[in-house]
């Protein structure tokens, strides 16, 4: 048995050959009878000898199969190649024909078979040639003793017994014929094994992935020999689906294809249908290819039935020929259709595909899959596929003209159908677009109507509540009330987006909290920024100093007034942090904050004060069901512009600079400037202001000294008197001359006061004509003073002056940095008259609430009389008013604008008046680097603070906790010079403390310090003149002496512009 295990392949081949020879000998003996000397020979002895031989062979075969089936094979090392051994020559057994007697055919006639026997024999032969007939296996078992297995449709060949044979890496060997089902194994074991069961034809079984095991003792030479025998698994038609599922990068072994052409393939990837085949993995261990034993060729799509290779193949697979005929017909038809000249068929692969059911044409997976199956049985399938893929190859074969005609008709029908479909689809699409547009338009119209109805309802409620507020105003101001401060800047969207730090800019009015100095007032302040605990604690302690200030004792207990204010922050701050929405809009979309405000004001008299009124202010007031102390947003947008202010000043009858407004075209700009220059020859500079801009951003100027015709025009003006000049024809000729030079004058000599928003004159001019603007004369004087007055237009009809102060201007002279309170530049009676007329004009236009009026005063160079011009009007709560409220709380005083005095209740000292210098926004790039706690410790160390006993010192206004880019500062002293000196000293100390030698930073500190130092330098020179004027003028001495001081101060501020 050991020898059998050693040479199992040889023993199997010998047993098969002996079995075939015995079967052939028995068949020949049965077919004829022999006769010797005229007598019939007895061949029973020979038949018995053959039977005994068959029984012996059967026993040996059974022992062989039992031994092989019980053997467990182990795979050899991957890197250790199989040793090549010389295959022994197969021994072919032949019966000893010499020992047989010479048999001669019997000469006596043999009777032929009956018709029934002939019919039965023909029927049996038909059944034998049809392996799919149910009785095929039964007839084989009855007539030949062969138990055939059940033929089943399988996608892969499954081997259920232990495979025997030589170990080839991770591959096993099995015959093409499938194994009988398990229920027939016992019956088959009792019979003699057939030739198919013992055949040594090597075909692949189902491949299984085996992990590569590295061996340290394997040499490089052996590995090189193994890798030379590389195979391309892409040519295995039976493993198409499996190879598509396996990764090409995994280190796994693949089953080898049973094709002789695989070893010499060019490893090209098939396109289209074959593109799904996985590429060969160079890391896997290759195995030698198995050469086909039964190949045959198909020439020009036809099989030669007389060819030797085809006859040999047909003889080998005669039992399954009925199933192979259909596959061969399909293959021939395909080769004929594509005019393939030569195709080599691998017989074993074709038989395997037929038996496994892979060539089942009724699986419905498409023509591409059928072509794959057919090509998988060809040894030269790459060449055939390349030929089939050539353009027009199908039309060269059988039925090419008809196929071309079908293709043309198909393409044309497809084109026609596609065109008709696209036309219909386009119509359907157009209908859908129209329907969607109509639906969208209908919804938008409905939404617009809803919004209009909602805004109309809010506007009606605003007017009705305003009337109720006007009726009960005196009662409300004398009783306990709650004021809701919403410091919203309701600018237009382009202006809001162009402002840097818009949220902090809205929070520069924290001084509104100081309204709680009235015992009947509670304040709810809505902050547009997130305030930290440091800022909240600062204002809590600051507002709690009222008792200490009133008693003049810093150690006094904290006042209960700090409990009468609430600071709220809308929850929508984080949701709209980058959209620059005004505070009213943020509050509108903050339902929790609105609900909390409702709870705080429930059962109390309350009203709301906004900044620059916006439409959402009305929505918030309507949601809270409280009146709004402000102006209708439409009216605010109309009169808060530069042109709107000019119209109010004109109707009020106050003096204002010569100019023109509502300019929207370039021709009107040129003509208006030429007319103004010709009419007012004394004006040396003209200003251009954009209607919607604030803070001096949208201002430009041009000097008339650059006109070439200016000397000639001046001579013409001198020849006429001022009264005659306005009516003479010379003015018209001068205007025409000026009109010719104006375009060049503006393009060459126009300058911008602030380049932070508009860099060039062209950019400024574009926005000027787009948004509208005004032309305004600059005061014709070297000494001028600007001041601002805050008015309250009460719902009851009264006009109150809440604050008045002289402005501190920046280097450009057109930008406000701070102010001094109270004002000392204009006679209080004149100021009160101007403010009253402007306030009444505003009330006639339904303007209510807080407004801010900008004035300029100077001495007329012709008659040296003081002139007061109204230059600007802002509708809303101003920063100066907020700082004034902080000043009044810290001094416990009252500001009497009728006399321009800040009256403080007397204390231990005899001083009963104070002066204050305030700045709303002190900017420094190093301020964000210092926390507020460190900042106040620094101020305390440097002696910067507020004396509650003397009611003078320094107070800061904090704006936010996050960025800390700016802060406000207020200095209070017994006189104006002391307040200015304290303010300048504080700026100098703060600048030195927060700035390093190598990092000074950008700020507006230096400009303010320089301006204040120049003003203080003139104080000593004016003291003597002030004393003399007090003796002469009596009552008016207080404001006249300081008027000269401020005239010099403002002249110093405007010198950079006049140069």
Curated annotation (Swiss-Prot):
Top-level taxon in the UniProt lineage: Eukaryota
Pfam families, alphabetized: ATP-grasp_IQCH (PF24923)
Keywords, comma-separated and alphabetical: Coiled coil
Domain IQ: start-end pairs: 401-430
InterPro entries, per the entry: ATP-grasp_IQCH, IQCH
Region of interest: Disordered: 245-267
Parts forming coiled coils: 6-35
Protein's UniProt name: IQ motif-containing protein H
Gene field: iqch
């Amino acid at each position: 048995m050991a020898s059998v295990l050693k040479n199992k392949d040889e023993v199997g081949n010998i047993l098969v050959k002996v079995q075939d020879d015995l079967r052939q000998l028995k068949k020949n003996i049965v077919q004829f009878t022999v006769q010797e000397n005229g007598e019939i020979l007895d061949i029973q002895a020979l038949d018995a000898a053959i039977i005994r031989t068959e029984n012996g062979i059967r026993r040996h075969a059974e022992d062989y199969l039992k031994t092989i089936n019980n053997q467990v094979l182990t795979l050899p090392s991957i890197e250790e190649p199989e040793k090549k051994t010389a295959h022994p020559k197969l021994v072919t057994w032949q019966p000893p024909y010499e020992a047989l007697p010479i048999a001669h055919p019997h000469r006596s006639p043999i009777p032929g078979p009956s018709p029934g026997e002939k019919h039965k024999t023909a029927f049996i032969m038909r059944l034998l040639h049809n392996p799919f007939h149910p009785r095929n296996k039964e007839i084989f078992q009855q007539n030949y003793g062969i138990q055939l297995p059940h033929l089943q449709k399988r996608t892969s060949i499954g081997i259920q017994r232990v495979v025997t044979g030589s170990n080839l890496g991770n591959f096993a060997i099995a015959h093409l014929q499938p194994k009988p089902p398990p229920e027939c194994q016992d019956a088959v074991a009792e019979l003699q094994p057939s030739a198919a069961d013992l055949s040594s034809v090597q075909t692949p079984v189902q491949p299984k992935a085996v992990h590569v095991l590295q061996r340290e003792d394997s040499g490089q030479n052996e590995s090189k020999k193994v890798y030379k025998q590389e195979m391309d698994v892409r040519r295995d038609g039976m493993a198409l689906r499996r190879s598509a599922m396996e990764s090409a990068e995994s280190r796994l072994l693949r089953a080898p294809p049973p094709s002789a052409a695989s070893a010499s393939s060019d490893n090209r990837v098939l396109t289209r249908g074959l593109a799904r085949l996985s590429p060969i993995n160079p890391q896997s261990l290759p195995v030698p290819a198995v050469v086909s034993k039964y190949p045959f060729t198909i020439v020009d799509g036809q099989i030669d039935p007389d060819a030797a290779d085809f006859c040999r193949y047909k003889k080998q697979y005669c039992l399954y020929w009925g199933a192979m005929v259909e596959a061969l017909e399909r293959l021939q038809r395909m080769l004929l259709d594509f005019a393939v000249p030569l195709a080599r068929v691998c017989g074993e692969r074709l038989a395997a595909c037929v038996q496994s059911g892979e060539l089942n044409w009724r699986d419905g997976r498409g023509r591409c899959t059928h072509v794959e199956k057919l090509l998988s049985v060809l040894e030269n399938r790459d060449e055939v596929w390349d030929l089939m893929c050539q353009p027009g190859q199908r039309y060269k074969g059988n039925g090419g003209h008809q196929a071309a005609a079908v293709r043309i008709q198909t393409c044309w029908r497809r084109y026609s159908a596609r065109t008709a479909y696209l036309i219909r689809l386009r119509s359907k699409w157009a209908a859908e677009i129209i329907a969607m547009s109509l639906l969208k338009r209908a919804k938008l119209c409905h939404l617009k109507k809803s919004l209009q109805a909602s805004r109309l309802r809010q506007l009606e409620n605003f007017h009705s509540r305003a009337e109720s507020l006007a009726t009960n105003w005196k009662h409300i101001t004398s009783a306990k009330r709650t004021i809701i401060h919403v410091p919203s800047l309701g600018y237009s969207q382009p202006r809001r987006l162009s402002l840097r730090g818009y949220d902090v800019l809205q929070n520069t009015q924290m001084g509104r909290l100081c309204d709680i100095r009235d015992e009947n007032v509670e304040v709810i302040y809505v902050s547009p920024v997130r305030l930290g605990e440091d800022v909240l604690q600062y204002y809590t302690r600051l507002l709690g100093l009222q008792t200490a200030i009133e008693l003049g004792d810093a150690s006094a207990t904290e006042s209960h007034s700090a409990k009468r204010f609430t600071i709220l922050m809308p929850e929508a701050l984080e949701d709209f942090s980058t959209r620059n929405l005004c505070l009213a809009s943020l509050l509108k979309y903050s339902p929790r904050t609105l609900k909390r405000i409702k709870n705080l004001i429930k059962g109390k008299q309350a009203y709301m004060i906004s900044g620059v009124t916006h439409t959402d202010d009305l929505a918030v007031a309507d949601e809270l069901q409280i009146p709004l102390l402000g102006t209708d947003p439409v009216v605010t947008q109309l009169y808060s512009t530069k042109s709107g202010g000019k119209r109010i000043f004109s109707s009020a009858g106050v003096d204002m600079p010569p100019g023109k407004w509502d300019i929207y075209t370039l021709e009107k700009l040129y003509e208006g400037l030429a007319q103004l220059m010709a009419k007012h020859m004394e004006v040396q500079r003209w200003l251009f202001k954009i209607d919607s801009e604030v803070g001096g951003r949208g201002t430009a100027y041009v000097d008339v000294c650059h006109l070439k015709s200016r000397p000639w025009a001046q001579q013409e003006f001198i020849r006429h008197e001022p009264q005659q000049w306005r009516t003479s024809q010379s003015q018209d000729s001068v205007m025409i001359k000026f009109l010719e030079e104006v375009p060049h004058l503006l393009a060459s000599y126009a300058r911008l006061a602030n380049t932070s928003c508009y860099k060039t004159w062209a950019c400024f001019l574009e926005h000027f004509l787009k948004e509208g603007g005004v032309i305004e004369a600059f005061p014709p004087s070297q000494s001028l003073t600007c001041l601002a007055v805050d008015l309250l237009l009460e719902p009851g009809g009264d006009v109150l002056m809440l604050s008045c102060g002289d402005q501190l201007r920046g280097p450009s002279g057109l930008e406000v940095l701070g102010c001094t309170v109270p004002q000392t530049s204009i006679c209080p009676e004149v100021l009160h008259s101007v403010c009253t007329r402007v306030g009444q004009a505003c009330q006639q236009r339904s303007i209510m609430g807080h407004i801010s009026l900008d004035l300029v005063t100077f001495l007329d160079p012709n008659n040296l009389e003081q002139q007061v011009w109204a230059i600007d009007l802002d509708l809303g709560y101003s920063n100066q008013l907020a700082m004034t409220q902080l000043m009044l709380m810290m001094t416990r005083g009252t500001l009497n604008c009728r006399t321009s005095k800040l009256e403080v209740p007397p204390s231990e000292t005899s001083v009963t008046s104070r002066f204050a210098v305030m700045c709303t926004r002190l900017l420094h790039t190093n301020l964000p680097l210092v926390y507020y706690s460190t900042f106040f410790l620094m101020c305390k160390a440097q002696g910067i603070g507020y004396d509650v006993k003397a009611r003078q010192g320094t107070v800061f206004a904090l704006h936010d906790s996050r960025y800390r880019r700016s802060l406000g500062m207020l200095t209070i002293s017994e006189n104006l010079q002391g307040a200015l000196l304290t303010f300048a000293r504080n700026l100098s100390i703060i600048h030195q403390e927060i700035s390093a030698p190598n990092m000074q930073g950008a700020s507006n500190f230096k400009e303010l310090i320089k301006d204040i130092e120049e003003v203080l330098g003139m104080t000593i020179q004016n003291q003597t003149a002030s004393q003399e004027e007090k003796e002469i003028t009596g009552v008016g001495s207080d404001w006249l002496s300081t008027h000269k001081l401020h005239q010099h101060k403002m002249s110093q501020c405007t010198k950079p512009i006049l140069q």
